[in-house]
Amino acid sequence: MLDKVIRIISFFRILILLTTFSPLVHAASLDSADIERFLEQSSWGPTYASTQYCQQLGSFENCLQEQFNASPSLYPLIVAAPQRSIQLCPKGSPAICFRDNYTQYPNQVIFFNNALAGSDQLRQRVAFALHQIFVVSGVKITQPSYMVPYLNILLKDAFGNYRDLLKDITLNPAMGHYLDMVNNDKTNTAGTINPNENYAREVMQLFTIGLNWLNPDGTLIFDHQNQPIPTYNQDTVEGFAHVFTGWTYANPSTSLASKFPNSLNFADSMVLFRDKKGVDTHHDKGLKMLLSLSPNGAPITLPAKQDGQVDFEAALDNLFNHSNVGPFIGKQLIQHLVTSNPSPAYINRVSTAFNTGRSNGFGTGNRGDMQALIAAILLDIDARGALKTEVNYGHLREPAQFVLNILRTSNAQSDGILNQLTTLMGQNIFNSPTVFNYYPHSYMIPGTLVDGPEFGIDTSIAAIARENFINSLVFSKINVTGSVGTSINFSQLNTLAANPLDLINTLDQVFLHSTMDQNMRTQLLTIINSISAKNPLLRSQTAVYLVLTSNQYQVQR
């Protein structure tokens, strides 16, 4: 049998509808395989229409520009439910009452529908990557209404500037609640209240600079004892924690807060509380130590008695202008979109684009320009061109990408109720178990020195779940109460099944972008020929199942 890769899911609840299976058309002016690889990196999977359109545009730069210009498909605002679920969903209420108002289910359905059919594919893909860097989780932010503004920030700022994204996320109430910045108070005279350090630590470790000083190519900088040099210490954490004091929920639709702590409001950005005289009475007024500008440099300090807004902007500037941001964030976005193990040269080129704000004709020339950063990642020589055959190139398709790629590429019909599938594979969308994402970005494949972040959730259970998903999608029709379902139609493939080589060539083109190796092709041919030509459906189903469960498909290259 064909090699089975990595994991493949338990999908016991999907109703199957009919749709048309549309093979992708190879491009003429651009390299066909590269167009399809480009769309796998820049969208949730190539479709017949997207492949044709990119081909017609004539260049990857034009394809990128079209996506940069596409209007965002945002999450619709949801009216906040009462804090206590018993008020809205008393005992005896249908289960969907709690599901729709006190879980991330509504946002999950929107996510999958936008990923499957949204015209802003690149924005959707980048926003999800940013969500895995700036993690906010429904494990703590349970109401879907609370999460919507955060999700829309990721979409709106995906093509803007990283400094704006950093500010918008920092002042988002869902983030404020998740990492305890909202209602973070200054030290009181009795010493019983001290500024919370949670957001201060994570904004450095996860959202901007990482733990150790980096060269522009992402490699570590070492001290004279050949040890990595930390980017910050406890004094730095305390300095930022004191900066982030005095912020609370805004009064609805205003930039003011009437009290501290103020009443819950997840719809508007947090504000700095000021008393009737305009004084920020809950902001710490002491001297604050921030980050140094070089590995051996003295830390930047904020003077005492500054206004809280001034401290806040200066602290974000200090973070944003740190030399680590380009390689630290750039590498993570490369890992999400292209390959888990980018070369130092690749990271350096992407880092340069972040620093200069320009790449391949994109960008404003301002540091942190996201369009320049994205263009540098997707148009780089390490992303484009001939198929990359290095053993450590590419990345395991994370569950969301695995499911969505298959459905988009096969032109599936779906209602977007798909989160139960990815959850079984280890990725419960918008419910990351910790602030460190669904899987750690630094995860190495056991027994190797190769980064493989997505393998961090690639357990034996997840592997079985992936296989069960493919098995159910290809061979079964499983009814789900209240769900339209998801399905593909094999009618077109069935017409090819009489000639196994035609069937194999089509699947190679559709799913593997004409890169199927000879060993896999030979094994497929043997297996298909072992099935009677009088049963074209079984031939088609078996071939699709074997291709999608192969290691050649599981790893996006």
Residue ranges with predicted function:
Residues 1-10:
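N-terminal secretory signal peptides that target proteins for export/translocation
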Residues 27-28, 59:
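Eukaryotic PEST-like, Ser/Thr/Pro-rich intrinsically disordered regions enriched for SP/TP/PP repeats
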Residues 28-30, 36-43, 322-326, 330-370, ...:
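Flexible, low-complexity segments enriched for small/polar residues
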Residues 48-157, 182, 255:
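N-terminal accessory alpha/beta regions
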Residues 55, 90-95, 99, 104-112, ...:
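Active-site substrate-binding loop specific to GH73 endo-beta-N-acetylglucosaminidase modules
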